[in-house]
A protein has these predicted regions:
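Terminal, non-catalytic protein-protein interaction segments that mediate quaternary/complex assembly
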Residues: 1-218
Length: 218
């Protein structure tokens, strides 16, 4: 197994580096089970992404004029994703929302830090349960670990599977907004994001877009 380490200053930088490097470092295969069964994707075997200043604006990738590549996400979509992170409200067609698991845990983590002190390893927010494996499309984000160190709130994230092209920028922007909110409620500054996954991938229908955006396609 190859473990890739990527260090970036901000969220757009992290996205660009991951997209650029996956064509050299990724493993290409055909999906046997899961979303887009039968299609190909290229995937990091395991990746750790450290983002030192994730709050730097803009939070989402900026596509240069003339690149002829549609933006992978928008702040409007990020705000919709944030709502799914922090509230348990679920639409009829949805099998789950992250907020079902996170809503009460967010409040408890804030309370824990404010009332019991900053030096703890117990402020971890879990997503999913034993029944999640039976879902047709189980939750991709499986955990948000937190750490307050050097006066800042840091997030450590794990994704079991993660769409790099559009999911990565949307998810991290939404989680950054959540981290900023929690930091203000706790009374500390905003810190880093360290995200890891054994399934950060790009589907074959996005390969040409990704290669165009990163300058790999001439």
């Amino acid at each position: 197994m190859k473990i890739e380490f990527i260090q970036a200053r901000d969220l757009p930088d992290a996205w660009f580096q991951c997209v650029y490097n996956i064509f050299d470092k990724g493993y290409e295969y055909t999906i046997d089970r899961g979303s887009f069964k039968g299609q190909k994707r290229i995937e990091y075997e395991y990746v750790v992404v450290q983002i030192t200043h994730p709050g730097t604006r803009p939070l989402i990738p900026d596509i240069p004029p003339g690149c002829n590549v549609p933006p992978p996400t928008s702040m409007e979509y990020v705000e919709q994703y944030l709502e799914k992170l922090i509230t348990s409200r679920k639409d009829v067609h949805e099998t789950y929302t992250y907020g079902e698991d996170l809503e009460k845990q967010i409040d408890e983590v804030i309370r824990m830090y404010r009332e019991e002190g900053l030096n703890t390893n117990q402020a971890y927010m879990a997503v999913g349960d034993a029944s999640s494996i039976l879902l047709e499309d189980p939750q991709c984000l499986r955990g948000i670990d937190t750490r307050i160190r050097y006066g800042k709130l840091h997030f450590m994230l794990y994704f079991r599977s993660w769409d790099l092209w559009a999911g990565f920028p949307s998810n991290l922007a939404g989680l950054q907004l959540l981290k900023e909110y929690m930091g203000k409620e706790i009374g500390v500054e905003d810190g880093e994001i360290i995200a890891s996954s054994k399934g950060l991938h790009i589907y074959d229908y996005c390969w040409e877009l990704a290669q165009t955006r990163t300058g790999r396609k001439k």
